[in-house]
From Swiss-Prot:
The gene is INHBA. Residues 1-20 form the signal peptide. Residues 178-197, 259-306 are annotated as: Disordered. This is Inhibin beta A chain. SMART domains: TGFB. Glycans are attached at residue 165. It comes from Sus scrofa. Keywords: Cleavage on pair of basic residues, Disulfide bond, Glycoprotein, Growth factor, Hormone, Secreted, Signal. PROSITE patterns: TGF_BETA_1 (PS00250), TGF_BETA_2 (PS51362). It holds the Pfam family TGFb_propeptide. InterPro entries: Cystine-knot_cytokine, Inhibin_betaA, TGF-b_C, TGF-b_propeptide, TGF-beta-rel, TGFb_CS. Disulfide bonds join 312-320, 319-389, 348-421, 352-423. SUPFAM superfamilies: Cystine-knot cytokines.
Length: 424
């Protein structure tokens, strides 16, 4: 069954490549290719006067992506004032002093944000009961062991308020982080006794918030800087103490119970002073405090760094990305394409030795590695296959242009520009 699946995948891949590449004898003019990189790679770049053929391939690709059979016929230029008004209403960019339109690269920024979000992990850690009254401990999951940059960190606490409260509308809630004090510190003992901690611990205020005490609800306390310091120190546990001095005036209480049983808390002599005593245990567990952490790896992190494709520099013959820019002014298309000023028609070229096949960080890698495994061992039907240099990462492109009716159109085209190349 796995072999049949691989054969089907391979045949489908070959069909796509053949379909998107021009026939060798046709000069690349048979149809607008779906993959400009494939078409450009097959053109004879070393042959004199081959540049026009590459430009023609790019032209056909752009028209194909815009669903146009031919370039629009713009008989009269649109007045600059009308163009400015249209761009302002479309919120797509601005016109520079030189008359060129600069597009706001929203789609590019979205792509960058999506890539960044893919690298970001979200971890939710529920609180455990601390070693002293009104204390909690948050153990950051081992899943976050390779995360070093905190994007956001918040502690969520539930404040329970009795229905009869009419005495105070606002209360102040403070969070203190417990920190170990170096042994032998002169003022450790007195301060620690005041807050009920062992002598080697002290505390620092990390978050404070004035909240509405007229209804029971969740409250969020930002603690990003504290978690960042914790990770920088190589630690994974956050110990905090909560304080709500005005809560007793309203009868309000913070639900703080972790895994300790209610009877154990009562055995310690806890009273209704902001600790959630006297509430049904099951409901308390549903209101259990938690830490929400969003973090990512540092760009300088040496491990699991995303492999980047090679840039062709004339010194390597291994699969790489070849830069190729087509100016719309140079090809006479700036009369109907308002922005951008040109197209980065990058393409992939180079050899794919067996030892680097399937090494890119793309979705092709898994299939390529499996097929390469069978191919190197001489298994049919993969024995005579050769790996291909293909795009592994593409980014979108925004275009602003006139149609035949001189209407201004903005279109975001996905997978338009080759960013990285790899071996299939």
């Amino acid at each position: 069954m796995p072999l049949l699946w691989l054969r089907g995948f391979l045949l489908a891949s070959c069909w796509i490549i053949v379909r998107s590449s021009p026939t060798p004898g046709s000069g690349g003019h048979s149809a607008a290719p779906d993959c400009p990189s494939c078409a450009l790679a097959t053109l004879p770049k070393d042959v004199p006067n081959s540049q026009p053929e590459m430009v023609e391939a790019v032209k056909k690709h752009i028209l194909n992506m815009l669903h146009l059979k031919k370039r629009p016929d713009v008989t009269q230029p649109v007045p600059k004032a009308a163009l400015l008004n249209a761009i302002r209403k479309l919120h797509v960019g601005k016109v520079g002093e030189n008359g060129y339109v600069e597009l706001e690269d929203d789609i590019g920024r979205r792509a960058e944000m999506n890539e960044l979000m893919e690298q970001t992990s979200e971890i939710i850690t529920f609180a455990e009961a601390g070693t002293a009254r009104k204390t909690l401990r948050f153990e950051i999951s081992k899943e976050g062991s390779d995360l070093s940059v905190v994007e956001r960190a918040e502690i969520w606490l539930f404040l329970k308020v009795p229905k009869a409260n009419r005495t105070r509308t606002k209360v102040s809630i403070r969070l203190f982080q417990q920190q170990r004090r170096p042994q032998g510190s002169a003022d450790a003992g007195e301060e620690a006794e005041d807050v009920g901690f062992p002598e080697e611990k002290s505390e620092v205020l990390i978050s404070e918030k004035v909240v509405d005490a007229r209804k029971s609800t969740w409250h969020i306390f930002p603690v990003s800087s504290s978690i960042q310091r914790l990770l920088d120190q190589g630690k994974s546990a956050l110990d905090i103490r909560t304080a709500c001095e005005q809560c007793h005036e309203t009868g309000a209480s913070l639900v703080l119970l972790g895994k300790k049983k209610k009877k154990e808390e009562e055995a310690e002599g806890r009273k209704r002073d902001g600790e959630g005593a006297g509430v049904d245990e099951e409901k308390e567990q549903s209101h259990r405090p938690f830490l929400m952490l969003q973090a990512r790896q540092s760009e300088e992190h040496p491990h699991r760094r995303r492999r980047r494709g090679l840039e062709c520099d004339g010194k390597v013959n291994i699969c790489c990305k070849k830069q190729f820019f087509v100016s719309f002014k140079d090809i006479g298309w700036n009369d109907w394409i308002i922005a951008p000023s040109g197209y980065h028609a990058n393409y992939c070229e180079g050899e794919c030795p067996s030892h680097i096949a399937g090494t890119s960080g793309s979705s092709l890698s898994f299939h390529s590695t499996v097929i390469n495994h069978y191919r190197m061992r001489g298994h049919s039907p993969f024995a005579n296959l050769k790996s291909c240099c293909v795009p592994t990462k593409l980014r979108p492109m925004s275009m602003l242009y006139y149609d035949d009716g001189q209407n201004i159109i903005k279109k975001d085209i996905q997978n338009m520009i080759v960013e990285e190349c790899g071996c299939s």
